[in-house]
């Protein structure tokens, strides 16, 4: 991404010896690299043999993905899926595919600490943006940085590869999942009335990233932003649910 920004600046001044003013976007990019390089200091830049695989896909409806340890049995609980909002669904297919990786990785990361992770995607642009830590389009580069930031937070080393669409059926099915009872929501106006009478409520026990009614929430399956999955096992001491 910095190389693309450099080329863009040089195309305007057409002189390698002239000073170039750093734009806010360039400064933001440099600050991100400074932070991330400190986290990766001393770690190998050569891809190591992966121990886990994470496979994702996206559709116009939603996103989905699953993960497993190499050579182990695939478990249904090791998968995540969700819907795109109406606004999100209008973005390009490349945006949706990269976002599918970002959201699935956030959901899976607590289970994949300190692992070399092979990320399988049927979108070549997604593969390139992850492996190159960005590209020409700022909006896609921002998602790629988010993927790497999540990976660094949990000590994960990601490597993206292309998986042909015809071999990506499980993730594709997850991305096209229709709503079920776990995706239902209490009418917001009724929740507000209940919150005024018995609140404030500290957590929504049955929600996802789009229909949550409190900042903190539990989801039925692994979710990129939930504090826990399976609310029946969540300790409620000190909570007002």
State each model region's role.
Residues 1-45, 165:
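C-terminal reverse transcriptase regions that engage the nucleic-acid substrate
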Residues 44, 84, 178, 195-240:
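Adenosine-cofactor binding site in Rossmann-like domains, unifying the SAM/SAH pocket
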Residues 47-61, 204-209:
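Two-metal-ion RNase H-like nuclease active-site motif
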Residues 70-99, 107, 124-139:
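A short, polar/acidic, helix/strand-boundary loop motif
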Residues 99-118, 226-237:
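Short, basic/hydrophobic alpha-helical segments
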Residues 105-173:
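RNase H catalytic domain
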Residues 132-139, 174-184, 220-222:
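Short secondary-structure boundary/capping segments
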Residues 155-198:
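C-terminal functional segments of enzyme domains
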């Amino acid at each position: 991404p910095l190389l693309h920004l450099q080329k863009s600046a040089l195309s305007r001044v057409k002189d390698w010896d002239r000073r170039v003013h750093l734009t806010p976007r360039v400064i933001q990019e440099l600050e991100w690299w400074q932070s991330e390089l400190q986290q990766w200091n001393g770690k190998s830049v050569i891809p190591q043999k992966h121990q886990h695989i994470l496979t994702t896909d996206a559709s116009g409806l939603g996103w989905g993905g699953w993960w497993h340890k190499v050579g182990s049995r695939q478990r249904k609980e090791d998968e995540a899926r969700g819907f795109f909002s109406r606004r999100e669904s209008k973005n390009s297919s490349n945006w949706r595919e990269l976002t599918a990786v970002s959201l699935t990785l956030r959901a899976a990361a607590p289970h994949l600490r300190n692992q070399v992770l092979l990320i399988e995607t049927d979108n070549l642009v997604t593969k390139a943006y992850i492996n190159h830590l960005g590209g020409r389009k700022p909006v896609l580069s921002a998602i790629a940085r988010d993927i790497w930031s999540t990976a660094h937070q949990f000590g994960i080393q990601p490597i993206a590869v292309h998986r042909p669409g015809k071999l990506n059926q499980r993730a594709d099915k997850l991305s096209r999942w229709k709503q079920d009872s776990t995706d239902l929501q209490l009418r917001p106006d009724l929740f507000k009335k209940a919150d005024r009478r018995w609140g404030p409520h500290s957590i929504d026990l049955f929600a996802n990233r789009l229909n949550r009614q409190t900042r903190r929430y539990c989801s039925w399956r692994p979710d990129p932003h939930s504090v826990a999955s399976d609310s029946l096992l969540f300790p409620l001491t000190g909570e007002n649910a």
